[in-house]
């Protein structure tokens, strides 16, 4: 059973889990992969419980005014607020929104653009469940990929992060290009 135990104080978060991790409003955030690999684009992120469970469980902590950029998933995603106050917004333009607090839950359907931000006054935590053993991939709105590239961050066609300031794109890989406006809508 010890390989199925995750103590929060023993988890090792990624502080650069996604392509937008260097952008203002996204860089003071930690991502934890607790059960399964989740959708983190950081290939070095530690996965605490690696055996398949039929779902993936992770956690996100963020400082005030930090969270994720607009993105979609190919699997359902459920957020369980543990602490703090979070704004969730959705749609290709991100104009629909709600505020959630400790104990609240929201289930985001597949292929819908969504994002979240800590709107409280201290670091806050939530748990995230992704459906299925295969958590699928993330699709970012074009603006996020373009701004991330300006910081040197890009995504490769295997959905892994690359720091263009440190390394070149491997010959057997291509960078993911932003989706078109038609694909966004």
Question: Model-derived features: where do they sit?
Answer:
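Conserved metal-binding segment of the jelly-roll/cupin
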Residues: 62-65, 100-120, 131
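Double-stranded beta-helix
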Residues: 3, 115-185
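A short, N-terminal "cap"/entry segment at the start of jelly-roll beta-barrel domains
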Residues: 1-54, 158-185
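Conserved short histidine dyad/triad with adjacent acidic residue
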Residues: 38-45, 56-72
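A short beta-strand-loop-beta hairpin characteristic of the jelly-roll/cupin
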Residues: 72, 76-102, 112
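Short histidine-centered beta-strand/loop micro-motifs
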Residues: 46-51, 68-73, 90, 97-99, ...
């Amino acid at each position: 059973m010890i390989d199925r135990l995750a103590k929060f104080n023993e988890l090792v978060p990624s502080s650069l889990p996604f392509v937008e991790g260097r952008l203002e409003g996204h860089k003071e955030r930690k991502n934890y992969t607790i059960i399964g690999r989740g959708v983190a684009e950081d290939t070095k992120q530690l996965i605490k419980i690696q055996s398949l469970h039929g779902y993936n469980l992770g956690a996100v902590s963020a400082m005030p005014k930090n969270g994720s950029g607009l993105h979609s998933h190919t699997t359902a995603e459920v957020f369980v607020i543990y602490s703090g106050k979070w704004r969730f917004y959705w749609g290709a333009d991100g104009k629909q929104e709600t505020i959630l607090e400790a104990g609240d839950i929201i289930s985001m359907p597949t292929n819908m653009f969504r994002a979240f931000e800590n709107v409280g006054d201290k670091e806050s935590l939530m748990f995230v469940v992704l459906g299925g053993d295969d958590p699928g991939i993330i699709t970012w709105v074009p603006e996020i990929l373009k701004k991330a590239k300006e910081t040197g961050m890009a995504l490769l066609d295997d959905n892994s992060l690359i720091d263009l300031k440190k390394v070149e794109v491997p010959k057997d890989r291509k960078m993911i290009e932003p989706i078109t406006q038609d694909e966004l809508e």
